[in-house]
Amino acid sequence: MPLLHKIAGVVIVCAVVLGLALPGERGGGRDEGKAAERAGAASRTPAEARAAKAGRTPAPGGSGTASPTASATAPIAAAAPAAAAAKANELGQVPVLMYHRILKKPELSLDRSTKELYDELTRLAKGGYHPITAAEFVGGRFTVPAGGHPVVLTFDDSTPGHFGLDAQGNPKPDTAVAVIEQVARENPGFRPTATFYLNKDLFGMDDVQAAAGLKWLRQHGFEIGNHTVTHPNLAGMSEKGVRKEIGDMEDRIAKLTGAHTTTFAYPFGSVPKKEKWAEKQDGRYGFQGMFLAGWRPSTSPFDGDFDRWKIDRVRSEGKIKENDCKRYCSTAWLDYLDKHPDERYTSDGDPNTVTFPKAAEDRIAKQYRARARTY
């Protein structure tokens, strides 16, 4: 989809400048002060970007979360010695990486080569990162070994370079899924999973192939997400148009898989006039998390500032001049987090607890306070 990729590049740049891709108040209230704050985010250093509060809404309670009636002032229990030794910080930032076409030889600015994908995933594996799905991230229930770091791998537009099955029923060589599985084989402990956000052209497959392919992905631990039928800019569409784009795609996914999706990624990162149009339509779709096309890691799902309706992502790219990738794309952010490990999400190894340094106690979302542990 060359034209879409060209448009995507332009829209993402505009989003950075205008602050459209950065999180803000849910459901309105965008006064001039807020707009100025978001517009300035593009010129901040990574540290400044993290420090700037965006007024997000709390994360939703997931399975095992604290009761809403739990006291917000109750003392937080001490962390396990092993968690403290691992320097766990489960209020740290989480990279949610955004990929588009995967090709042997990139053609457009958003493309990544199979080698670039392999090298980046290998870097993640060697750096102690462990992939989780977008749904697991949003729900705040995932398992990462103590001392490790979660990362969410997302692939937009369901292009042929993402996935396909050969005659033997195995992932086709040089596709994203094949590369992910190769890196997992070479790096024990690196979980082979990712989230694929689908448009109508399902990896270049017909409906029979798509049904088999989507079944294979789900059976092997990959997540399927909604990305609309035709990848339009939802910001300029009517309620009817927004619901048709999302609902028709959801109908097709449900027909092919027998299941509904949990998460949604905005095409171009563009939010419609009323966010509720995209979030839910009774009897048709209802998402638990919505992903943007932003330029910084996400806040932890346990942080009181986490907004599940506007989750930041980072474009996969090296430190190139285009779109200020020297500072805001994946290589730059991974370098930054390596140099500032205290700002990165580091797991305590126990999915039933949320461990962090005592100095960060005021940041824990109230619904997770009963699971909190400090040191």
Task: Identify the role of each PLM range.
Residues 1-26, 40-44, 48-51, 55-58, ...:
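C-terminal active-site subregion of NodB/CE4 polysaccharide deacetylases
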Residues 167, 196-203, 230-239:
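Surface-exposed cleft-lining segments at the edges of enzyme active sites
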Residues 199, 229-230, 269, 295:
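Histidine- and/or cysteine-centered catalytic micro-motif in compact active-site loops
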Residues 31-41:
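Juxtamembrane extracytosolic/periplasmic "stalk" immediately C-terminal to the first targeting helix
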Residues 89, 144, 180-191, 205-225, ...:
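Acidic (Asp/Glu)-rich catalytic clusters
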Residues 95-98, 130-134, 152-153, 176-207, ...:
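Short, well-structured secondary-structure segments
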